[in-house]
């Protein structure tokens, strides 16, 4: 089972990726994680990627693709994988498809978790985190007993900079520009499947399991 996970920030991809990985016994490959691993291990590609990151530049496709290719050749990917955070562009998708075709491991499913923008805004801008113990809350879905105070240690709750409305809208705009062409690419290839990400975690995972069960 070879799967790509698509969806906007705040769609719950991380939660679903963990559940998919456990149920279908395939590694969850996050591009952020493999970048950090390569940089930490000082691999040639990691050193090159760090040079761009340290200079505040985007890591070029050839470096990103090289790091992903290297990860996909590991033994734990023999029976499949779940890619999260890659590809981000059609050019990356084409390079990935060419590589996978060459090793006889073409993609089975591009899984899109769909969530309306207003739902994401409410979900992300309502998040609060404790400045001391790191406990997470949501002003609507999981509020603290006392407004602005952590239930566990009574310290102040704050909104992270990443969760302000302006930042969330900016991230959603970047996602739209990057990902809509990618969604159309996988639609044209006939492998995209969509799930409604506004339902509960269990309901979303149930729908995903049905889709992946069909494609096994």
UniProtKB/Swiss-Prot annotation:
Q: Where does AMP bind?
A: 31, 36, 57-59, 85-88, 92, 160, 171
Tell me its EC number(s), please. Answer: 2.7.4.3
Look up the record and name the pathway of this protein: Purine metabolism; AMP biosynthesis via salvage pathway; AMP from ADP: step 1/1
Positions binding ATP in this chain are 10-15, 127, 136-137, 199
The GO cellular component terms are: cytoplasm
Keyword set, alphabetical order: ATP-binding, Cytoplasm, Kinase, Metal-binding, Nucleotide biosynthesis, Nucleotide-binding, Transferase, Zinc
List the catalytic activities from the record: AMP + ATP = 2 ADP
Q: Which CDD domains match?
A: ADK
What compartments host this protein?
Cytoplasm
Assign the protein's first listed, main location to one coarse class. Answer: cytoplasm
Q: Does the keyword Transferase apply?
A: yes
> Which Gene Ontology molecular function entries are recorded, alphabetically?
adenylate kinase activity; ATP binding; zinc ion binding
Alphabetized InterPro entries for the sequence: Adenyl_kin_sub, Adenylat/UMP-CMP_kin, Adenylat_kinase_CS, Adenylate_kinase_lid-dom, P-loop_NTPase
Ranges where the record places region LID: 126-163
Q: What class of enzyme is it?
A: transferase
Under SUPFAM superfamilies, the record lists: P-loop containing nucleoside triphosphate hydrolases
Gene Ontology terms: biological process: AMP salvage
Q: Its family?
A: Belongs to the adenylate kinase family.
Q: What is known of its domains?
A: Consists of three domains, a large central CORE domain and two small peripheral domains, NMPbind and LID, which undergo movements during catalysis. The LID domain closes over the site of phosphoryl transfer upon ATP binding. Assembling and dissambling the active center during each catalytic cycle provides an effective means to prevent ATP hydrolysis. Some bacteria have evolved a zinc-coordinating structure that stabilizes the LID domain.
Q: What does this protein do?
A: Catalyzes the reversible transfer of the terminal phosphate group between ATP and AMP. Plays an important role in cellular energy homeostasis and in adenine nucleotide metabolism.
Database matches in NCBIfam families:
adk, PRK00279.1-1, PRK00279.1-2, PRK00279.1-3, PRK14527.1
User: Quaternary structure?
Assistant: Monomer.
What is the protein name given in its UniProt record?
Answer: Adenylate kinase
| Lineage, broadest ranks | Bacteria, Bacillati, Bacillota, Clostridia, Eubacteriales
């Amino acid at each position: 089972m070879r799967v790509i996970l698509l969806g906007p920030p705040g769609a719950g991809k991380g939660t679903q990726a963990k559940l998919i990985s456990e149920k279908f016994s395939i590694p969850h490959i996050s591009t952020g994680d493999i970048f950090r691993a390569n940089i930490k291990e000082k691999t040639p590609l990691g050193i090159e990627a760090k040079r761009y990151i340290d200079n505040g530049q985007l890591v070029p496709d050839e470096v990103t693709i090289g790091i992903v290719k290297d990860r996909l050749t590991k033994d734990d990917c023999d029976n499949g994988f779940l890619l999260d955070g890659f590809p981000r562009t059609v050019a990356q998708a084409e390079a990935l498809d060419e590589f996978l075709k060459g090793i006889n491991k073409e993609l089975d499913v591009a899984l899109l978790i769909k969530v309306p923008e207003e739902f994401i805004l409410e979900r992300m801008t309502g998040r609060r985190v404790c400045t001391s113990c790191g406990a997470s809350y949501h002003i609507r879905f999981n509020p603290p007993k006392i407004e602005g105070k952590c239930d566990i240690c009574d310290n102040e709750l704050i909104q992270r900079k990443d969760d302000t409305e302006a930042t969330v809208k900016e991230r959603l705009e970047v996602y739209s520009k990057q990902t809509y062409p990618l969604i159309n690419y996988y639609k044209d290839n006939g492998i995209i499947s969509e799930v409604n990400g506004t339902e509960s975690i269990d309901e979303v995972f149930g729908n995903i399991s049905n889709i992946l069960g069909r494609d096994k």
